[in-house]
């Protein structure tokens, strides 16, 4: 379960091409992120739910004007998220949320139960299909094209009855999906008049429940900004 305390954190200003780098590889654990990137948001949420706000420093980047030193000295892939820890850099959001859960102290975000772990692994693998389908739908008929993957999530939420989340209690699976649900719920409703929760009561309840979590709520984007970002990048 997520920590019960509320840690209020000010968001640092994003670093851009004019910004000096931090003191790299000085023993500080840093999460290089972007406030608009759903993949990076996964790791940010995990950090918060583990209660690691004071142990992992946020280093947000301006992806539209990113500093050259990031690619040259930190992460040659030049993407976010990336974690600077113990003198090395680790990337890829799904790998990172597992790494944070397995490496750092704090509440476990993946169950011990074999059946739940097996289903959780299946759902984590499905994120690629889900994300690709949702983005591709923006060029066609989202109401029709997103239905199969949204129905998949709706049905998955019936699997366990010991809580409102995919594996009953909140886990890495919920964290992997919520940044994308957050964005597409807003974009499809605002631009296509498509309600992704219509006739999907479990998905609706899941969204309502996870929005109560402070560790997630502090990472959310402004809905107006979501729409503007999608208009600019994908439409």
Curated annotation (Swiss-Prot):
GO MF annotations, alphabetized: glutathione transferase activity
Keywords in alphabetical order: Cytoplasm, Detoxification, Transferase
Entry annotated with the keyword Transferase: yes
Gene Ontology CC entries for this record: cytosol; plasma membrane
Domain named GST C-terminal: residues: 86-230
EC number(s) from the headed UniProt entry: 2.5.1.18
Domain called GST N-terminal: residue spans: 27-108
Major enzyme class: transferase
Signal peptide positions on this chain: none
Chief site of localization: cytoplasm
Lineage top rank: taxon: Eukaryota
Subcellular location: Cytoplasm, Cytosol
CDD domains given in the database record: GST_C_Lambda
Disulfide bond positions: none
Function: Catalyzes the glutathione-dependent reduction of S-glutathionylquercetin to quercetin.
Protein family (similarity comment): Belongs to the GST superfamily. Lambda family.
PANTHER family per UniProt: GLUTATHIONE S-TRANSFERASE L1, GLUTATHIONE S-TRANSFERASE L1-RELATED
Name this protein carries in UniProt: Glutathione S-transferase L3
Originating organism: Arabidopsis thaliana
Phylogenetic placement of the source organism: Eukaryota, Viridiplantae, Streptophyta, Embryophyta, Tracheophyta
Gene symbol of the encoding locus: GSTL3
